[in-house]
Amino acid sequence: MINKEISVINDLVLQMLDLSKLEAKAVTLDKKEIDLRELTEDIVDDYEQLLMDKKLKIEIQGEDVLIVSDRKRIEMVIQNYLSNAIKHAFINSTIKIKIKENEFSIENKGKQIDENRMDSIWESFVSDDQKGTGLGLAIVRNILELHEMSYGVHNLEDGVEFYFRWKK
């Protein structure tokens, strides 16, 4: 129990340090050409057990798309979007990941986000989840801004879609 608490505190400290570096623009991006679909498939594989536990399916749409970015940082963005989609998805639903020429999106069927909170979810320490730190989307925002990518979220009829876009 104590080891788990120490691990949680350690993760929180590391996230806060990472966020402060990102906000100060004290991060050098290691930009290289990456295959976004391949990266996405690798990330989805890591979530296989969690997906089975929640009886969720993943559908990846789109072809191989190459972008120039920092692989580690874009991986963090996709992991955050996917973990949030899983956390808030209805059991027995499908999460759709769409990879287009200049857009990546993840949509789930689940609880919508209050329209009044759409802008604030990107700020530090804002979370719907008592277990969450509220740092994930703030880190995502800073990573995407460093990459000069746009990003956003909107409610769907029966869920939520998060996306990011880049210039082609």
Question: Which residues fall in each region the model found?
Answer:
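Short helix-loop "hinge" at the ATP-lid/N-box region of the Bergerat-fold HATPase_c
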Residues: 85-86
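Short conserved segments within the C-terminal catalytic ATPase subdomain
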Residues: 50-59
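Glycine-rich ATP-binding loops of the HATPase_c
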Residues: 148-156
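Short alpha-helical segment of the dimerization/phosphotransfer core of two-component systems
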Residues: 4-9
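Conserved micro-motifs of the catalytic ATP-binding
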Residues: 24-29, 62, 66-72
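A conserved beta-strand-to-alpha-helix junction within the catalytic ATP-binding
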Residues: 30-48
